[in-house]
A protein has these predicted regions:
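Conserved short acidic donor-positioning loop in nucleotide-sugar-dependent glycosyltransferases
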Residues: 10, 22, 37-39, 62, ...
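A conserved hydrophobic helix/loop-capping motif in glycosyltransferases and polysaccharide synthases
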Residues: 2-14, 18, 25, 35
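Acidic donor-binding segment of Leloir-type glycosyltransferases
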Residues: 19-57
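Positively charged, low-complexity/disordered segments
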Residues: 109-113
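Conserved donor NDP-sugar-binding/catalytic core segment of glycosyltransferases
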Residues: 88, 92-108
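Glycine-rich, basic loop-to-helix element that forms the pyrophosphate-binding segment
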Residues: 58-75
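Short aromatic/hydrophobic "clamp" motif used to bind/position activated sugar donors
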Residues: 80
Length: 113
């Protein structure tokens, strides 16, 4: 249902904690697309998770906005969520959003900050 887009630049140490926090979601109706924006030390995901994780590495630094766009173009799901590498979702965010979408079948865009 969701692809969570995570831009990251020179903060690979944030990624394990971010992914671990997503294991606390009350549903796993999502995958994660991490866009490594040409960090000095590349982002690597070596652990398995109960959701798919894809890492894309930019060959040149593109900035956070373009990295989000790259993530969106490489997303596999219909709904996109954006999460910075040093931020965390509430544990029930994906479930609550799925419930809202199910209740409002014609919804095409939701935003929460």
């Amino acid at each position: 249902m969701f692809s969570i887009i995570v831009p990251s630049y020179n903060r690979k140490e944030e990624i394990p904690a971010l992914l671990e926090s997503l294991t606390k979601q009350t549903t796993y109706n999502f995958d994660v697309v991490i866009v490594d924006d040409c960090s000095k030390e590349p982002v690597e995901v070596t652990q398995s998770y109960p959701f798919a994780v894809k890492v894309i590495r930019n060959e040149t630094n593109q900035g956070a906005a373009e990295s989000r766009n790259i993530g969106a173009r490489n997303a596999d799901n219909e709904w996109l969520l954006f999460l910075d590498d040093d931020d965390r979702f509430a544990n029930d965010k994906c479930q609550k959003l799925a419930d809202v979408i199910a209740d409002r079948k014609s919804t095409r865009l939701n935003s929460s900050h």
